[in-house]
Amino acid sequence: MNIALLKSKIHRASVTEARLDYVGSISIDEKLLQASGILEYEKVQVVNINNGARFETYTIATQEEGVVCLNGATARLAEVGDKVIIMSYADFNEEEAKTFKPKVVFVDENNTATKITNYEKHGSIF
């Protein structure tokens, strides 16, 4: 049996752009992708903290510092300045799942990584 677990998370990133006339996806600063362990073209779930919207798309790396840009139809699901959580998941067998820890990247208002952990605590942003 395989179990899907949180693999990587970029927490409370600010949407910097929303481009409706684009093929699709979410463009993310390549430094954030590297810090989180999310790969380019990897499927991600995005949760908009401001309006509760949840959607899936794939990532595109950009060299533009601090960029988190919703492309195509997903541009309708957030406004510039909205806070989002970007998550990827992976399947593990039961033994792997018992010891696996996700990579969680916390960012500031400029989408610069401020803290990287491998855990989350109930009731705490950090």
UniProtKB/Swiss-Prot annotation:
Q: Which GO terms describe its molecular function?
A: aspartate 1-decarboxylase activity
Q: Which Gene3D superfamilies match?
A: 2.40.40.20
> Which cofactors does this gene product need?
pyruvate
Q: Which one GO biological process term can you cite for this protein?
A: pantothenate biosynthetic process
Does this entry carry the keyword Cytoplasm? yes
Organism this protein belongs to: Campylobacter jejuni subsp. doylei (strain ATCC BAA-1458 / RM4099 / 269.97)
Q: What is its EC number?
A: 4.1.1.11
Q: Which family does it belong to?
A: Belongs to the PanD family.
Q: Where is the active site?
A: S25 (schiff-base intermediate with substrate), Y58 (proton donor)
- Which gene codes for it? panD
Could you say which residues bind substrate here? T57, G72, A73, T74
Q: In which pathway does it act?
A: Cofactor biosynthesis; (R)-pantothenate biosynthesis; beta-alanine from L-aspartate: step 1/1
This protein is called what? Aspartate 1-decarboxylase
UniProtKB keywords: Autocatalytic cleavage, Cytoplasm, Decarboxylase, Lyase, Pantothenate biosynthesis, Pyruvate, Schiff base, Zymogen
